[in-house]
């Protein structure tokens, strides 16, 4: 971070800029404690450290970034923007797992959701693309990168999301399995003799597209599938099937859907994924304009047919802008 700050300082936009009013930090896990952007003081930083067991791969790096930025500009407010915060509006029945309540409460076992800054940005940007107030728009957001998640957003408020206590739940991802029968873990331990750490590594780092066909890059999966590779085709079909299931489920949750928005690396660039995911969903009001869908553009755009009841949008996400916007709004309110 110090090296980045030095590089930015060369053109006057670094941490030493007199125009700097805040430093925004992405913090992956806010638990139930942090449900909105928060100015960081010693107490807040200590609470973020306490959440490390819920995000052992991410929160330690987030803490380090905060510490470095505070040391460089102690006079400027540091703001934590939490990936989980946007999903904190889910009703309790959507956030709870159906396990023993005392055990769940004792170990903070519940659904938190992730990619929240992206889902927040894209849901608002989709409403703007439709020319309607965000409060009037119901949208299913599909954030499809190496990590992938879906959310159901009613009037700018998240009511359901696919990731759970960790980013492992939900859609098929580059290296993560997504939804899985929990008993698979018991089976692998009892019959396969795998340790907890080995199963953790298997499900998070060696599953998903990578586990099914040996590639986690959707471009390679598509190339191989197009050349007749059966394992790549199966991986692609499994990926798309899971997407369809979530689109259908979230259509039921929302009741009325105004748009389905695709975002992130795969969602923005892989027109084949969008086409396959929407194919066959005309009864839900979803029909693509195939030419518009295949055309590339860096701008937010509609790719649905003119007669479609539900818009299909491609909306490039901007998590950095969302973090900056939320941080600025907090310190200038």
Protein language model features and the residues they cover:
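Phosphate/pyrophosphate-binding loops at sites that engage ATP/ADP/AMP, CoA/4′-phosphopantetheine
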Residues: 6-21, 126-133, 247-258
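General beta-strand structural signal in soluble alpha/beta enzymes
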Residues: 25, 56-60, 77-82, 88, ...
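Glycine-rich phosphate-binding loop of actin/hexokinase-like ATP-binding domains
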Residues: 86-191
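Glycine-rich beta-strand-to-loop/alpha-helix junction loops that act as flexible
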Residues: 25-30, 144-146, 257-269
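Internal helix-turn-beta structural module
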Residues: 233, 237-258, 267-333
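Short beta-strand-loop/turn "lid" adjacent to the catalytic site in phosphate-handling enzymes
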Residues: 8-58, 77-79, 85-96
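Catalytic phosphate/nucleotide-handling subdomain of diverse soluble enzymes
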Residues: 153-154, 159-195, 201, 264-295
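A mobile "lid/hinge" subdomain adjacent to the ATP/sugar-phosphate binding pocket shared
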Residues: 191-235
């Amino acid at each position: 971070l110090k090296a980045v700050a030095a590089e930015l300082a060369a053109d006057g936009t670094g941490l030493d800029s007199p125009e700097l009013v805040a430093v925004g930090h992405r913090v992956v896990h806010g638990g139930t404690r942090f449900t909105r952007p928060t100015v960081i003081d010693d107490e807040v930083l200590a609470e973020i450290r306490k959440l490390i067991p819920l995000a052992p791969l991410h929160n330690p790096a987030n803490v380090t970034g905060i510490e470095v930025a505070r040391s460089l500009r102690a006079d400027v407010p540091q703001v934590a923007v939490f990936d989980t915060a946007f999903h904190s509006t889910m009703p309790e029945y959507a956030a709870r797992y159906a396990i023993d309540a005392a055990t769940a409460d004792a170990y903070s076992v519940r659904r938190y959701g992730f990619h929240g800054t992206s889902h927040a940005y894209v849901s608002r940007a989709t409403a703007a693309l439709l020319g309607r107030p965000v409060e009037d728009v119901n949208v299913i957001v599909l954030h499809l990168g190496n990590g992938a998640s879906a959310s159901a957003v009613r009037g700018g408020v998240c009511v359901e999301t696919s990731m759970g206590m960790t980013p492992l739940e939900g859609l098929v991802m580059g290296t993560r399995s997504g939804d899985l029968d929990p008993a698979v873990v018991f089976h692998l331990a009892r019959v396969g003799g795998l340790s907890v750490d080995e199963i953790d590594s298997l499900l998070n780092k060696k599953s998903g597209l990578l586990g099914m066909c040996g590639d986690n890059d959707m471009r390679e999966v598509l190339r191989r599938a197009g050349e007749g590779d059966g394992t790549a085709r199966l991986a692609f079909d499994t990926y798309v099937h899971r997407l369809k299931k979530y689109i259908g489920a979230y259509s039921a949750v929302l009741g009325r859907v105004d748009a389905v928005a695709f975002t992130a690396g795969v969602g923005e660039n892989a027109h084949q994924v969008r086409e396959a995911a929407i194919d066959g969903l005309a009864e839900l009001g979803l029909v693509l304009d195939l030419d518009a869908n295949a055309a590339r553009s860096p701008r937010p755009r509609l790719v649905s047919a003119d007669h479609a009841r539900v818009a299909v949008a491609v909306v490039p996400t901007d998590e950095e802008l969302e973090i900056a916007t939320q941080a600025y709004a907090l310190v200038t309110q």
